[in-house]
Amino acid sequence: MKLVLQRVKEASVSIDGKIAGAINQGLLLLVGVGPDDNAEDLAYAVRKIVNMRIFSDADGKMNQSIQDIKGSILSVSQFTLYADTKKGNRPAFTGAAKPDLASQLYDSFNEQLAEFVPVERGVFGADMQVSLINDGPVTIILDTKCH
């Protein structure tokens, strides 16, 4: 899995002008699923995300997790994280998982996250508009195959 984590003051995702999900303080996750991803990748990503200390404590030090601050997650599927830009000017997305597998793993990922923190989400495969107010900004790239 490839994920982009953005610390946000607020974020929302809309489809056809209607809000599908919205959060206040927490994390916006852009989630890409690869063809070799499995339950171990999901567990690793969930564990890292819910425990990562990227929120400020009273002293302004990044020392608190999303659980500590009682934050929420907005999860948005994002197959374009697997873009291959080596040849030409048009990216190829053949490195992303096929939609059936990606949808199943994305759903499972969100269900596992929801065991720890509230999770709002977009609609898998939909054309979505994402709005956010970055906090920091703090943006982290997480690749479950690089640990």
Swiss-Prot record:
Residue window of motif Gly-cisPro motif, important for rejection of L-amino acids: 136-137
Domain of life: Bacteria
GO BP: any one term: D-amino acid catabolic process
Enzyme class: hydrolase
Keyword hit for tRNA-binding: yes
Catalysis performed (reactions): glycyl-tRNA(Ala) + H2O = tRNA(Ala) + glycine + H(+); a D-aminoacyl-tRNA + H2O = a tRNA + a D-alpha-amino acid + H(+)
A Gene Ontology cellular-component term: cytoplasm
Gene3D superfamilies recorded: D-tyrosyl-tRNA(Tyr) deacylase (3.50.80.10)
Database matches in CDD domains: Dtyr_deacylase
E.C. number: 3.1.1.96
Pfam families: Tyr_Deacylase (PF02580)
Keyword set, alphabetical order: Cytoplasm, Hydrolase, RNA-binding, tRNA-binding
A GO MF term: D-tyrosyl-tRNA(Tyr) deacylase activity
InterPro entries: Daa-tRNA_deacyls_DTD, DTD-like_sf
Subcellular location: Cytoplasm
Quaternary structure (record): Homodimer.
Family recorded in the similarity comment: Belongs to the DTD family.
Domain notes: A Gly-cisPro motif from one monomer fits into the active site of the other monomer to allow specific chiral rejection of L-amino acids.
Function: An aminoacyl-tRNA editing enzyme that deacylates mischarged D-aminoacyl-tRNAs. Also deacylates mischarged glycyl-tRNA(Ala), protecting cells against glycine mischarging by AlaRS. Acts via tRNA-based rather than protein-based catalysis; rejects L-amino acids rather than detecting D-amino acids in the active site. By recycling D-aminoacyl-tRNA to D-amino acids and free tRNA molecules, this enzyme counteracts the toxicity associated with the formation of D-aminoacyl-tRNA entities in vivo and helps enforce protein L-homochirality.
Name of this chain's protein: D-aminoacyl-tRNA deacylase
Organism lineage string: Bacteria, Bacillati, Bacillota, Bacilli, Lactobacillales
